[in-house]
């Protein structure tokens, strides 16, 4: 499915992908990740980028419920993406968060939730609504009642975006904030 945006991000086309389509575009996706997270704000080191390319993304492609949105600019270049999958106990992120939050929060939020693993927008496309378009397009394609994600501290550029979409913090530790959104609750 493909949508042209009628907002400042209108120079981009959003497309929804399943695991096979995402795997076919892996080279472009990985280049976009490298470009997005090598900027001055994020400054992800080479080791972290290599881990994403060689281990994390290939592993995530195989997770149940994997779904992705990608954005291509008018030149056809992939300039952003967002993806997630069904989070379960026994997976790294779910277990990492579960060990750091109150058991009642764990029971309420984790296991069977849709987990947003990455939202990446290349620097030249930031501030135009593309991150919002990628995330909302992905969420609109999902039916899970709970969505969870983690971002850097509250001063992360993405934090206000998540809050504006109805995500609320339910964990705050190790320089990260864990946010969740119940789909049966309207977003702001």
What are these regions (language model features)?
Residues 107-109, 114-133, 154-160:
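Conserved glycine-rich acetyl-CoA-binding loop
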Residues 2-54, 68-78, 86, 188:
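Short amphipathic alpha-helix that is part of the acyltransferase structural core
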Residues 55-59, 137-141:
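A generic secondary-structure signal
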